[in-house]
Amino acid sequence: YESPNMVNWIDKNDMPKANGNVYESPALDGVGIWVENKVKPIESGKSESELREEIIKVLEETGTEIIVSYLPVGSEKATQFWAQVCLDTNTAFVNCMPAFIASDKEWAQKFTDKNIPIIGDDIKGQVGATIVHRTLARLCDERGTKIEKTYQINVGGNTDFLNMKEQERLVSKKISKTESVQSQLTDRLDDDDIYVGPSDFIPFLGNTKLMFMRIEGRQWANIPYNMEVRLEVDDKANSAGIVIDAIRLA
């Protein structure tokens, strides 16, 4: 309930007490330049190797079975750190952000060799922007039309969108989302004819995510058509409904 968290589905007074503890871990590249003034990790001065040893000890002592990563977009080093921790402790890994672990052949093979569940990468909401875009793109393709251009623009007001103002952190995110749509098409679009990704941070939107999507193409007799969709969802509830099933599967 502390800022900058925006999840308030249950009234604070109705939330039961929890026994979970918060432990320090290396921040690595987990905090981007746009969120530095909102998120200040507590750092004890311990080295990465010291913290790693402490983390492994806690995981073993608590009998942890699954690690769920909701690290900020662009946390490549931090994601690899936790993936390796999972391998070293035989812990399942649910990667909810677009750093390539499950979809990387080398990393995936490491998990396969040790028979450790790995689920990811990234996450599609229950009725989220990308799954809607994928479904409509596939529909147009299956109905025999020729998609010529498409875009999907997402805006929101939580720290996820604030973090994504840093373009350097978006490389894997845009690849993940763009490929998700391209994979539904019989004929891939040229890079200049497809755009899928976050557009901007609008503070007053809070946890509300808005998606604007457009598909342009041609149907029978080479006649042009287009469609536009506006989607409004609670960004985190949309995500949580899917990751719960991923945890059950792991």
Predicted regions and their residues:
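Generic detector of short, locally flexible boundary/turn motifs and exposed helical patches
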Residues: G32-W34, V58-E61, A83-C86, K114-I116, ...
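Glycine-/Pro-rich loop/turn segments that contact NAD(P) or position catalytic residues
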Residues: S75-K77, F81-T89, V94-E168
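Metallocofactor- and cofactor-centric catalytic cores in central/energy metabolism, strongly enriched
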Residues: Y1-A92, M97, I101-F111, N226-A250
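Active-site-lining helix/loop region of Rossmann-like oxidoreductase modules
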Residues: N5, V127-L249
